[in-house]
Design a protein with these regions (language model features):
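Beta-lactam-recognizing serine transpeptidase/beta-lactamase-like catalytic domain environment
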Residues: 125-137, 150, 174-215, 224-469, ...
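Second-shell loop/turn segments in exported
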Residues: 1-2, 9-13, 36-45, 74, ...
């Protein structure tokens, strides 16, 4: 029927915006004349809210049998915070299975799929009193919820620090993971991969899946084994000569071989300076005639332990054994400084976390609890995999070496540790740099830094890996160490709790009290009581919502720009002001937490539509 088709075309054009009203009219008439059983109306996905609105358009409101509107249902995993821990959280398949349920595809969505998707209900159609009636045979059961260990603040700053460096270095991919030392809870995990110049996204869980040759971070495990077996002490001298060492016809080189090498140094300094020659000589001295003993020692450290992770597709650490087809006379020395082994970044982090945790190797945790309707059904406790990876004496020696990798300052100024770029005046950091040449290309490298902070009372461990950078200095310290430093400083600063009772007021002047972004007139009433200046001195009556910038003694006020169809910036606002600003744009708001807004689900300046729901997190 062509009757009323003009009205339908008008409504479709106004709603879908992919054709004009005239274009829709011609398209619909063409389908009508073809007399096809199926004729696609709109080839893109629609939200359920939009679909419900379209069902009420002319023709379609008459129902399926007369109006002829049919739909294909699909589901999509909505991630309110974009790429944050996206690959770890996981995805679901778009197709809907029998019973109206979807299925986990990867990440935690796949691992906990049977708990998350619930159970479908069943009904039958029976004839009652001359009418057909639906009878529920089995009620559907809602799926459970999981509470992850991810800290949104730490995750956000970790991802930003990583992406900034990847863009600066034009690197192929990068990993950054932050773990809580005492529990093994993963507080942040970012896996970013270049999809086009300057743009990075989470496509693969590199932190768990990539079985990499770790390079010099592995020297810590080699040193731990040698110290534990009494092969050397931290003070033992070792001659690395000019930075080259020939063994079985191949040459082992230090990074400074071209400038003459380190000469005679101590065993501890071989870690500070990351000497390949030194660690190879130590391992050959102790294990050349019994390599099995060295391999057994590595197993005891837990660096290749089965972590039994919650995420499907996680890789496994691989350490060659004497007698393996790939074992050669060069395997032992090359293994000592991180080649001919494959270690996923999460394993390296768990090992370094154990060093920070007084020798206890913790299982990395991604899930805290299982919930139903907000109530915890099961709480996951921290799990110790190895109570003691080495003796306390060896542990203290290794901890001190890692501290000096970052913080040792040569009085002459020529031999600072390789981790100097990670040195911080805000928080004390201990760690180890890693630079590993990728076998497939002599020009490509994986650059890493792994460690913990603060050194005196470790709270967090962290690993950063930058893969295949095209720009910048090929150095684990310069590339990954600087990212580690930024993460550590920001995480530590956010954790500081000041003792206000010990602070004395400054007698000479009044300091600006904390003022949130938002409505300014209330703030002005408070600061006026403190006799604090404001600019401008007066606020127009119609100015209701404002951004502010509080300096030491002045409250600066300017009008909040709220544009139709554009997401405003509400970071830093209190709940009332954020809701006010968003609702002025015609948006709906979901809030979580208390305090100031720290995250908004749609970035400021991005296009939004009236009625769209925005999620904000306060802390």
């Amino acid at each position: 029927r062509e009757n009323g088709i003009d009205s339908l075309a008008y409504y479709l054009a106004r709603k879908l915006k992919n054709r004009t009203a005239a274009g829709y009219r011609a398209y619909l008439l063409r389908g009508l004349r073809q007399k096809s059983r199926q004729y696609p109306l709109y080839e893109y996905r629609l939200s359920y809210a939009d679909y419900k609105e379209i069902r009420e358009f002319p023709f379609f409101r008459l129902g399926r049998n007369i109006g002829g509107l049919y739909e294909r249902e699909m589901v999509q995993r909505q991630k309110l915070f974009g790429s944050l821990a996206s690959r770890t959280i996981g995805d679901i398949y778009n197709e809907i299975e029998t019973g109206g349920l979807s299925k986990g595809k990867n990440g935690l969505e796949l691992r906990y799929d049977t708990l998350l998707h619930g159970k479908p209900g069943y009904n039958s159609i029976v004839r009652v009193g001359g009418r057909w009636t639906n009878v529920v045979e089995e009620e559907p059961v809602d799926g459970l919820d999981i509470r992850t260990t991810i800290d949104l603040q730490i995750q956000d700053l970790t991802e930003k620090a990583l992406v900034d460096k990847l863009q600066e270095a034009d690197a192929a991919s990068g990993v950054a993971v932050v773990m809580e030392v005492k529990t093994g809870e993963v507080k942040a995990i970012s896996n970013m991969e270049r999809i086009r110049p300057g743009v990075y996204a989470e496509l693969r869980n590199h932190a768990l899946a990539d079985e990499l040759e770790p390079g010099s971070t592995f020297k810590i495990a080699s040193m731990m084994v040698a110290l534990e077996d009494g092969i050397c002490t931290p003070e033992s001298p070792i001659d690395v000569g000019n930075g080259t060492y020939k063994f079985n016809g191949r040459t082992i080189r230090d990074h400074n071989a071209q400038s003459g090498g380190y000469g005679t140094i101590t065993v501890a300094q071989s870690i500070w300076y990351s000497s390949n020659v030194s660690i190879a000589k130590i391992v050959l001295k102790g294990y050349a005639n019994n390599p099995r003993k060295f391999i057994d020692g590595l197993h005891r450290t837990g660096i290749d332990a089965d972590l039994n992770l919650d995420i499907a597709g996680a890789g496994h650490a691989k350490i060659r054994q004497p007698g393996d087809p790939q074992w050669s006379r060069m395997t032992l020395p090359w293994m000592s400084f991180g080649y001919e082994v494959q270690i996923p970044p999460i394993n390296t982090l768990a090992f370094f976390n154990a060093i920070a945790n007084n020798g206890r190797l913790m299982r990395p945790m991604f899930v805290k609890s299982i919930l139903k309707n907000g109530k915890e059904l099961r709480v996951y406790e921290p799990e110790v995999l190895i109570p003691e990876i080495c003796s306390k004496r060896t542990l203290r020696a290794v901890q001190e070496m890692m501290y000096n990798v970052v913080n040792y300052q040569d009085p002459v100024g020529r031999r600072d540790g390789t981790g100097k770029p990670a040195r911080s005046s805000v928080v004390s950091i201990a760690g180890k740099t890693g630079t590993a040449q990728i076998a497939a290309s002599k020009a490509a490298h994986n650059l890493s830094f792994c460690g913990y902070f603060p050194y005196e009372n470790p709270q967090y461990s962290c690993i950063v890996v930058i893969s295949r950078p095209r720009r910048g200095i090929v150095s684990g310290g310069m590339m990954a160490g600087t990212v580690f430093k930024e993460i550590a400083e920001k995480v530590y600063s956010n954790q500081i709790r000041y003792d206000l009772s010990s602070m004395k007021p400054e007698a000479s002047r009044t300091l600006m009290p904390p003022v949130k972004n938002g409505e300014s007139r209330s703030a002005q009433a408070v600061v006026k009581w403190f006799d604090i200046r404001t600019t401008p001195k007066r606020v127009d009556a119609d100015f209701s919502a404002f951004w502010r910038n509080a300096t030491r003694d002045t409250l600066n006020v300017r009008k909040l720009t709220v544009r139709e169809g554009m997401m405003p910036y509400v970071i830093g606002m209190g709940a009332r002001d954020a809701v006010y600003a968003l609702e002025r744009c015609g948006l709906r708001v979901n809030l979580a937490g208390h305090g100031r807004v720290i995250l908004q689900s749609v970035p400021s300046g991005q296009a939004v539509t009236r009625g769209q729901t925005i999620d904000i997190i306060l802390n």
